[in-house]
């Protein structure tokens, strides 16, 4: 095997995972797009959280909503925030309450009825994401989970689960950012009639 074959194998595996997404979760993705659109249209806020690569995806999606998704689409900023961005809050909460509480504590502080929390976890077992989703429920915050594998312990905790049909972390993360881009595209179409 040479490096070209390695690259080709990764690309083919990624394409196969995206095809499985079309076959099994397309309806859930469009439902999520409608949910995000309604929350933003009503003036509420979208929060996102995750760990590691999922944290990066959460920040990426939040940035696309605040700034814009498609180049050339001039529109107003939309209220979206990644809960991974404030190092002072993350370290203070980790020190005082434990790492598991870093997202739930922020939802307790900022989450309002009608807002939305999108939790990302490739395994579906991230304790801090799970606790944030549970806290969101107590605050009247709607919830969407982007998961992988069998959905883990987070499965069925949210108003809507989108479970990427793969057990490979890289394929799940690639699919999560694609789903995030689709959500942003649906939002720009629904709110601003931008394609």
Curated annotation (Swiss-Prot):
Keywords, ordered alphabetically: Carbohydrate metabolism, Cytoplasm, Isomerase, Metal-binding, Zinc
InterPro entries: GmhA/DiaA (IPR035461), Phosphoheptose_Isoase (IPR004515), SIS_dom (IPR001347), SIS_dom_sf (IPR046348), SIS_GmhA/DiaA_subfam (IPR050099)
EC number, UniProt record: 5.3.1.28
Binding, substrate: 51-53, 64, 95-96, 121-123, 126, 173
SUPFAM superfamilies reported for this sequence: SIS domain
Record keyword Methyltransferase present: no
Cofactors (names): Zn(2+)
Superkingdom assignment: Bacteria
Domain SIS: 36-195
Cofactor note: Binds 1 zinc ion per subunit.
GO biological process, one term: carbohydrate metabolic process
One Gene Ontology term, aspect cellular component: cytoplasm
Pfam families named in the record: SIS_2
Chemical reaction(s) catalysed: 2 D-sedoheptulose 7-phosphate = D-glycero-alpha-D-manno-heptose 7-phosphate + D-glycero-beta-D-manno-heptose 7-phosphate
Disulphides: none
Localisation: Cytoplasm
GO MF terms held by the record: carbohydrate derivative binding; D-sedoheptulose 7-phosphate isomerase activity; zinc ion binding
Homology family: Belongs to the SIS family. GmhA subfamily.
Function comment: Catalyzes the isomerization of sedoheptulose 7-phosphate in D-glycero-D-manno-heptose 7-phosphate.
HAMAP family in the cross-refs: GmhA
Name of the protein described by the UniProt record: Phosphoheptose isomerase
This protein's encoding gene: gmhA
């Amino acid at each position: 095997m040479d490096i070209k074959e390695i690259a080709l194998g990764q690309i083919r595996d990624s394409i196969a995972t995206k095809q499985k997404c079309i076959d099994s979760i397309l309806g859930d993705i469009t439902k999520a797009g409608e949910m995000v659109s309604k929350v933003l249209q009503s003036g509420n806020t979208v929060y996102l959280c995750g760990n590691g690569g999922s944290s990066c995806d959460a920040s990426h999606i939040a940035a696309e909503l605040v700034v814009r998704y498609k180049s050339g689409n001039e529109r107003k900023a939309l209220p979206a925030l990644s809960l991974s961005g404030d190092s002072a809050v993350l370290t203070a909460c980790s020190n005082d309450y434990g790492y598991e509480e870093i997202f739930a504590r922020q939802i307790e502080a900022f989450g309002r009825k009608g807002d939305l929390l999108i939790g990302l976890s490739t395994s579906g077992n991230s304790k801090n994401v799970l606790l944030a989703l549970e806290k969101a429920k107590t605050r009247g915050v709607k919830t969407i989970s982007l998961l992988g594998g069998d959905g883990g312990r987070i499965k069925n905790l949210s108003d809507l689960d989108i479970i990427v049909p793969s057990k490979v972390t890289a394929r799940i993360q690639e699919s999560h950012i694609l789903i995030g881009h689709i959500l942003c595209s649906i939002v720009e179409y629904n709110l601003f009639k931008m394609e």
